């Protein structure tokens, strides 16, 4: 399986905050696409965004910067403390950086955390359309690698 333009369009719509378009496009994905390919695309985009945000000059940032980021994400909306568990969110990032290990969580919980953290990371960058396209292209290439 490979990542399709349709799957990239679903993620793009979500990351630019176009909820209606995101839901419309997501409804068009077949369940296998959504469960395998789209999940891999989100994971790859999360990896790309987190590494860009939390690795500087080849070194991972301190734990405190990850903790501060997660706290800021949880403060952005009233419902965020109910959506984002700080222990899970921090462990996802720290595991990716090689500074900790992922706490036990079911796949749906991990995916939900990934997508919210990804949206926050992309939102911080304030990408132009061209920059977002380049970011999604990199994520797509990584996702294709993950699926092999």
Give the role of each language-model region.
Residues 122-148:
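Glycine-rich, aromatic-bearing surface loops/beta-hairpins
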Residues 68-123:
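Amphipathic protein-protein interaction modules
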């Amino acid at each position: 399986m490979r990542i399709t333009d349709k799957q990239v369009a679903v993620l793009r719509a979500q990351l630019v905050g176009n909820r209606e378009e995101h839901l419309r496009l997501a409804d068009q994905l077949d369940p296998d696409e959504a469960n395998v390919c789209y999940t891999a695309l989100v994971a790859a985009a999360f990896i790309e965004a987190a590494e860009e945000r939390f690795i500087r000059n080849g070194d991972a940032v301190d734990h405190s910067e990850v903790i501060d980021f997660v706290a800021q994400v949880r403060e952005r909306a009233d419902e965020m403390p109910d959506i984002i568990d700080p222990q899970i969110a921090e462990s996802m990032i720290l595991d990716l950086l090689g500074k900790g290990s992922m706490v036990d969580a079911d796949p749906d919980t991990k995916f939900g955390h990934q997508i919210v953290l990804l949206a926050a990371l992309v939102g911080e960058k304030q990408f132009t359309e061209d920059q977002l396209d380049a970011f999604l292209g990199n994520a797509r290439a990584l996702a294709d690698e993950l699926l092999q």
